[in-house]
């Protein structure tokens, strides 16, 4: 009996330990918040109470609860919140910046790998490594009829892959991303000097990158090192894919198109880490072995097209990573989605690998092409026909895609294929999954429901329902494509952007809001109604008129600046294109005080000879004073005739300033010479005294 009780207590303790471990594992990673304000991106590690074992206590009798008024210093709390929000914002911005800046480096890496494939000595060595029997099979296949060739090509390619796997071995880690290390280095960069332990841990993580990325081979001598790997028939799985690419190019006869595909291992800005410090200190995130078995999918694979056999047929070959024969050589159509290459997005099972883009490069023409829709789902937003008012244009995902597209144009130095773009668009717009929760709708750039529209957003009149969303309370709401959402702005906002509302344009929405100034003084009654318009309801702001008509209908040229003065005593010019003819803008600078020069000039002049100017408001500063829009005055407006006079004053002032500096320098030199002549050189006198 005692033995049974002892065993049961031990089992209970073990179960409690396992439950604690499971809790910790679940709370390590979270998806990033969708709010663009970046208010909370990681939770405080000391505030996590999930690991506390709560004890049940029976309550006999009454329970008295006393509420106390806890006074907190508002200014201190506000200062802490501002500091925390600023740190969180910088943390998220840095993660996104790393994601963007890695794109060109990864594209250059793909182009450099393709240059190795053209090396003649490397081709000769790999070609000779193929047995004559395999070469004979490919030659016999080449002379058969097209129907037989089309049916047997996959079998032939599969045999070549199996031979390659049995003869070429993996001996080191390939290219990979490490979420834990990057998150730690970003998040605790400012905290490494708190104590000696934090400093040593941070330094160790920074310098010992092989623990987090593996022991990758050093390629100091370029293709010469690759030749040595081919000679030993040992490399990492990325280089081995290049070897198979070269072998396939040399063995497969006839016209063909070979592409090297690369899933860009970019930094994932959509995930946040709650306990990254604890994980680093406990060795979580280190590479387990040199075979990269923790990486679910490959980063490099091959696409093959044989136009003479079948137009639109595509063979996708992975000679290294996949275990199933179907995934090793997959026969499909070029307009079909391939789901087997997208890593799992479940953060419990996969955090070390996730890719947003797949880019391929042609062996013959060395042209880079984006083939992401073939392998990555839910990228419809990249191929939407968007209006200028679409909020998708400002999303992080779409901005990242535009950045990739720009670099592809730069590296290709020519326009992308229209046919290829049409195929990718067709795949993208048909390969999507409907969101199942409100959180998923908030995260996606493809869909939206009316209840999640912002106060300055509205659906197009022609918007069509894509599906129906069922909420938790069994109520239903229509799902629309996010491309049908229009972002609206007020008249003042459009004016700042250099656009004016079209005549007879009716507001698409009216927004009721409480100005910040009224909120600060707790005046909750003075609401303001703003009319909101779309981009399509605006036009470029016209120029200020340069003429006016008097009461007799005669037209006169405007020469008086007071004609443009508003009630605040200035003129609003947000774009140089709206500047009235006959007048010029003079930028204000710290070097020369233009306004002071004009005032000094006007002192001795008659009224008709004086230079008149008008302050120009070119925008507003909303951060200088909370709740206020402080106008930015960075230039003044003067008549064209006065413009030349002001420029002459500026030139004369600069000359006088230069001469005054020379005068000061010469006076100092004269004083120095006089002191030396009368009292001698102080340094020489001290040396003379020391000698005596």
Curated annotation (Swiss-Prot):
Q: Where is the composition biased (Acidic residues)?
A: 28-38
GO terms (BP aspect):
mismatch repair; nucleotide-excision repair
> Is Heme there in the keyword field?
no
User: Does the keyword Nucleus belong to this entry?
Assistant: yes
Which SMART domains does the protein's record reference? Answer: BHD_1, BHD_2, BHD_3
List keywords of the entry alphabetically.
DNA damage, DNA repair, Nucleus
Q: Which Gene Ontology cellular-component terms appear in the entry?
A: cytoplasm; nucleotide-excision repair factor 2 complex; nucleus; XPC complex
Q: Describe the family membership recorded for this protein in Swiss-Prot or TrEMBL.
A: Belongs to the XPC family.
Additional record remark: Present with 78 molecules/cell in log phase SD medium.
The name of this protein is: DNA repair protein RAD34
Q: Which organism is it from?
A: Saccharomyces cerevisiae (strain ATCC 204508 / S288c)
């Amino acid at each position: 009996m005692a033995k049974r009780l002892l065993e049961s207590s031990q089992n209970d303790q073990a179960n409690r330990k396992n439950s604690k471990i499971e809790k910790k594992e679940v709370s390590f990673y979270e998806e990033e918040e969708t709010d663009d304000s970046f208010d909370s991106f990681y939770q405080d590690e000391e505030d996590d109470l999930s690991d506390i074992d709560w004890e049940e206590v029976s309550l006999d009798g009454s329970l008295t609860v006393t509420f106390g008024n806890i006074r907190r210093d508002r200014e201190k709390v506000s200062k802490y919140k501002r500091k925390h929000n600023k740190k969180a914002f910088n943390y998220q911005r840095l993660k996104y910046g790393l994601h963007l800046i890695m794109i060109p480096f990864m594209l250059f890496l793909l182009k450099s790998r393709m240059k190795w494939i053209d090396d003649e000595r490397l081709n000769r060595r790999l070609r000779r490594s193929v047995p004559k029997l395999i070469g004979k099979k490919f030659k016999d296949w080449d002379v058969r009829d097209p129907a037989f060739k089309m049916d047997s090509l996959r079998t032939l390619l599969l045999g070549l892959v199996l031979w390659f796997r049995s003869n070429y071995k993996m001996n080191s880690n390939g290219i990979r991303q490490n979420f834990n290390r990057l998150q730690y280095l970003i998040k605790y960069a400012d905290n490494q000097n708190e104590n000696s332990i934090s400093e040593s841990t941070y330094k160790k993580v920074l310098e010992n990158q092989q623990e987090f990325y593996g022991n990758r081979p050093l390629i100091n001598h370029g293709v010469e090192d690759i030749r040595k790997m081919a000679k030993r028939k040992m490399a990492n799985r990325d280089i081995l894919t290049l070897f198979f690419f070269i072998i396939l190019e040399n063995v497969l006869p006839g016209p063909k198109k070979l592409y090297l595909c690369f899933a860009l291992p970019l930094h994932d800005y959509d995930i946040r880490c709650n306990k990254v410090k604890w994980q680093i200190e406990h060795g979580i995130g280190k590479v387990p072995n040199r075979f990269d078995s923790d990486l679910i999918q490959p980063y490099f694979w091959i696409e093959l097209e044989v136009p003479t056999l079948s137009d639109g047929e595509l063979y996708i070959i992975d000679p290294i990573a996949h275990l199933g024969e179907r995934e090793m050589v997959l026969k499909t159509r070029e307009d079909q989605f391939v789901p087997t290459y997208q890593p799992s997005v479940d953060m419990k099972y996969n955090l070390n690998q996730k890719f947003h883009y797949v880019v391929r490069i042609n062996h013959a023409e060395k042209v880079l092409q984006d083939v992401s829709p073939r392998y990555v789902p839910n990228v419809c937003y990249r191929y939407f026909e968007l209006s200028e008012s679409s909020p998708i244009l400002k999303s992080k995902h779409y901005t990242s895609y535009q950045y990739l597209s720009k670099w592809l144009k730069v590296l290709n130095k020519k326009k992308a294929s229209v046919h290829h773009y049409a195929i990718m668009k067709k795949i993208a717009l048909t390969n999507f999954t409907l969101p199942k929760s409100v959180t998923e709708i908030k995260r996606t750039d493809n869909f939206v429901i009316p209840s999640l529209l912002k106060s300055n957003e509205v659906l197009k009149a022609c918007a069509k329902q894509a599906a129906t969303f069922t909420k938790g309370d069994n109520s239903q709401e229509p799902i629309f494509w996010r491309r049908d959402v229009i972002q609206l702005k007020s008249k003042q906002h459009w004016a700042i952007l250099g656009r004016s509302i079209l005549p007879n344009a009716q507001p698409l929405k009216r927004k009721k809001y409480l100005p910040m100034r009224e909120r600060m003084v707790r005046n909750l009654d003075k609401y303001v109604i703003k009319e909101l318009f779309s981009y399509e309801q605006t036009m470029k702001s016209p120029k200020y008129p340069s003429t006016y008509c008097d009461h007799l209908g005669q037209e006169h040229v405007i020469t008086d600046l007071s004609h443009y003065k508003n009630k605040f005593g200035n003129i609003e010019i947000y774009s140089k294109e709206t500047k009235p003819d006959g007048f010029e803008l003079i930028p204000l600078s710290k070097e020369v005080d233009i306004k002071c020069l004009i005032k000094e000039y006007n002192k001795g002049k008659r009224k008709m000879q004086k230079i008149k100017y008008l302050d120009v408001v070119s925008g507003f500063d909303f951060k200088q004073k909370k709740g206020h829009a402080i106008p930015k005055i960075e230039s003044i407006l003067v008549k064209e005739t006065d413009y030349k006079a002001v420029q002459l004053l500026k030139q004369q002032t600069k000359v006088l300033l230069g001469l005054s500096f020379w005068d000061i320098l010469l006076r100092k030199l004269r004083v120095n010479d006089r002191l030396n002549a009368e009292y001698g050189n102080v340094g020489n006198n001290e040396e003379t005294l020391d000698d005596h």
